Amino acid sequence: EFDLIVGHGTTLEHWELTIKFYLGIGDTTQTNAWFGPNPTDRLDLKLQRLLSHQMTLATTLAGQTLLKSQFGASNAEVKGIVKGRLFHPYSAWLDQQWQYPETIAADHLRGWWLTVDDFICRFNNGSPRFRPLTKRDWLSELQAVPVDERLPADRCLAALSSSREHYAHHVAMLDDNGLETSRGFVVMAPWLEVTQAQDQTV
């Protein structure tokens, strides 16, 4: 089905919309090096499906029939709109050494990722504080976080341990005033196992 049909002047436009979050591992200049929090989702596969299936819907007989019956036109200009955020390895993010595929906009939203062990090791001094992010928090920056929700790294992970997520946890890093300074993913062993296994088969 179409995501969105837009009338733009005398032109009919078919928009395919997607919001995705990908973590880069290995050679991050390649689209197959970017995996979702669920590592079965991969940037190159998503782009391939977007281009070969979703953005061709208007050229199918069913698509043209629907456009004709609903909008009086059998053709539509196609646009793919992909938004979201890329999460770079923490050291690359910290040094601003961002490497990403040439098809990605230079001003893309950025975050970082760490393994559980690296997260605890790097932030075991209790500073900065963090807040776990639920899915409804993923699209917008947090407002000032109450003091009792500003957690040190170990307590943040403890709070996340009760969730059913077993690949990666999304967290926001906070300043002393409880304002978000960045966001990232803390990935667990199963995420690394799946991404490394896929890397060997590419």
Positions of predicted regions on the chain:
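Intrinsically disordered, low-complexity Ser/Thr/Pro/Gly-rich regulatory segments
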Residues: E1-V202
